[in-house]
Each structure stands twice: as structure tokens, then as C-alpha cells.
């Protein structure tokens, strides 16, 4: 069961049993985490978490003091807690101390949390703590004046921020225009380079095609020349063969003529011999 959010009761009994937790990383630590940490000391009547600090309302003062003694200086979520009783702020600490009071650390939001007359709080804290009351009175008005001053500054800064935003938007639009012009220029340069590369490639292709056609023509001419030389060789060999045959035929004819002549001579000689023999017989 979750505790109540009410931690601003003005009766002294509630004040003595209320614990202030300062330097709290409220971005990480939630109300349930605070209740889980402090519930081990006793019953929690109320718990409220604000930006940077929190309050825990216990049922009695003894439990609250035990919780302060047990958790003061503990590190949670990367920050060292500054814990004290809400009725006993640490205004009496030395100026060189590490920890500060809640009013110094958190400004007017801490003071507004109590929601009771400032004179009563000052008198009560003066009776409980030996710290001089004028310090507490001097701190609070200065903080409140700073808040009002901050509000006026916020108004001025808001106007200035609007004008600054307008100026920034005009500068950004101008920068965007310059960037666009630069990009456009680079793109045009890239396009020119690509076009020149394409022209070079086309020229190379044309030259290569011309070389290929020339090689084809040379090869075809070489093949034609080879064919012509082959035909010539064949014709020459045929002519030489025919000439050889003719020569052979001529030689054979001459041989036959000589044989015929020799045969005629032999027949003539035989006739002469026969005639001479006949003459002798007669």
C-alpha cells in the first residue's frame, strides 16, 4: 500500500517526524523507491517526491531520527543524499562543509513545501537549533527576490529567444541555400566528367571496331593470297607434269623410229643377200 502524498502538515509533531531528502536524482529514483528505502525504519505516513528532493513523513520522531542517521550521506543513483529532519535544517553547519541546507540547495520551492507562516518556522527552528535566526530570514527573501528576477529575465529571454530563433532560422535557410548551390555545382561537375568518360569510351569502341575490321580485311587478303599461290603452284605442277609426259612421248617416238629404221635396214640387207645367192646359183 502506497503512502499518502501529504507531507506539509504544520503541527509540531508532524514537523519532528518529517525527513527531508536532498540531492536526490529524481530522474531515476521514484516515489516507490524512496518508500522502499525508508520503510525499513518504520511506518511511513506520507511521501512526496519533487524535482531534486523529497519528503518522508514518519509516524513518530524517533523513527525519523533513526532514518536520518542511517541514510544521511548514502549514495543513490550516482548522488550523495543530504538528509536531515525537516524541522532541523542544517543551517548551523560550517561554510566549508560539503552539505548545504535545503533552502540553499533548492531555493523557494523547498520553503513553499511547508505551507505555514515563516515566523512560526523561524521561531521553532531557533528553539530547536542553536543557529542564529537572522541567517534563515536573510536567506529566504533573497531567494524569493531572485525568483521574481528570474521571472522578469525569463520574459526578456523569451523574447530574445524568439528573435534568436528567427535569426537562426534565416541563417539556417541561408546555409541550406548555399549548401544546395554547392551540391548543384558538384553534381554538374560530376555530370560533365561522366559525359567525357562516355565520349572516351565511345571513341575507344569505334577505334577498336575499326581495328577489328582492318584485321579481318588483312586476314581475308592473306587467305586469298594463300589460295592464289596454292592455285598457281597446282597449275605449275600440272604444267610440269604435262611437259614431262610430252617429253617421254617424244623419246618413245624417237625410239620407235630408230627401231623401224633398223628393221628396214635389216630387211634390205636380207634382200641383198638373197639376190646375191640367186645370182650365184644361176
UniProtKB/Swiss-Prot annotation:
Its main location: nucleus. Residues 177-217 form a coiled coil. Residues 17-88 form the RRM domain. Residues 161-172 have a biased composition (Low complexity). Disulfide bonds: none annotated. InterPro entries: hnRNP_C, Nucleotide-bd_a/b_plait_sf, RBD_domain_sf, RGS_sf, RRM_dom, RRM_HNRPC/RALY_subfam. Pfam families: RRM_1 (PF00076). It comes from Xenopus laevis. The gene is hnrnpc. Belongs to the RRM HNRPC family. RALY subfamily. GO terms for cellular component: nucleus; ribonucleoprotein complex. It comes from the Eukaryota. GO terms for molecular function: N6-methyladenosine-containing RNA reader activity; RNA binding. CDD domains: RRM_hnRNPC (cd12603). Residues 236-257, 265-282 have a biased composition (Acidic residues). Binds pre-mRNA and nucleates the assembly of 40S hnRNP particles. Interacts with poly-U tracts in the 3'-UTR or 5'-UTR of mRNA and modulates the stability and the level of translation of bound mRNA molecules. Single HNRNPC tetramers bind 230-240 nucleotides. Trimers of HNRNPC tetramers bind 700 nucleotides. May play a role in the early steps of spliceosome assembly and pre-mRNA splicing. This is Heterogeneous nuclear ribonucleoprotein C. Tetramer. Residues 131-177, 208-282 are annotated as: Disordered. Gene3D superfamilies: 3.30.70.330. Residues 208-217, 224-235 have a biased composition (Basic and acidic residues). It is found in: Nucleus. GO terms for biological process: mRNA splicing, via spliceosome.
Amino acid at each position: 500500500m502506497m503512502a499518502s502524498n501529504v507531507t506539509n502538515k504544520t503541527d509540531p509533531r508532524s514537523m519532528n517526524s518529517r525527513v527531508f531528502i536532498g540531492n536526490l536524482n529524481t530522474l531515476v529514483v521514484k516515489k516507490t523507491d524512496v518508500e522502499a528505502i525508508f520503510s525499513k525504519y518504520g511506518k511511513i505516513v506520507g511521501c512526496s517526491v519533487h524535482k531534486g528532493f523529497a519528503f518522508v513523513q514518519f509516524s513518530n520522531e524517533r523513527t525519523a531520527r533513526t532514518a536520518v542517521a542511517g541514510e544521511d550521506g548514502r549514495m543513490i543513483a550516482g548522488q550523495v543524499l543530504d538528509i536531515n529532519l525537516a524541522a532541523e535544517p542544517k543551517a548551523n553547519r560550517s561554510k566549508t562543509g560539503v552539505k548545504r541546507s535545503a533552502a540553499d540547495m533548492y531555493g523557494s520551492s523547498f520553503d513553499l513545501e511547508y505551507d505555514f507562516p515563516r515566523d512560526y518556522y523561524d521561531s521553532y527552528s531557533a528553539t530547536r537549533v542553536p543557529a542564529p535566526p537572522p541567517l534563515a530570514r536573510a536567506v529566504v527573501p533573497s531567494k524569493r527576490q531572485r525568483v521574481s528576477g528570474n521571472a522578469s529575465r525569463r520574459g526578456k529571454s523569451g523574447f530574445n529567444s524568439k528573435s534568436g530563433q528567427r535569426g537562426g532560422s534565416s541563417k539556417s535557410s541561408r546555409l541550406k541555400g548555399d549548401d544546395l548551390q554547392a551540391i548543384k555545382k558538384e553534381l554538374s561537375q560530376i555530370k560533365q566528367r561522366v559525359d567525357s568518360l562516355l565520349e572516351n569510351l565511345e571513341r575507344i569502341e569505334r577505334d577498336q571496331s575499326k581495328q577489328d575490321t582492318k584485321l579481318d580485311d588483312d586476314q581475308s587478303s592473306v587467305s586469298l593470297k594463300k589460295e592464289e599461290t596454292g592455285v598457281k603452284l597446282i597449275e605449275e605442277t600440272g604444267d610440269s607434269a604435262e611437259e614431262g609426259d610430252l617429253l617421254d612421248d617424244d623419246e618413245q617416238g624417237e625410239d620407235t623410229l630408230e627401231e623401224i629404221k633398223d628393221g628396214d635396214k635389216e630387211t634390205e640387207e636380207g634382200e641383198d643377200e638373197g639376190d646375191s645367192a640367186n645370182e650365184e646359183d644361176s
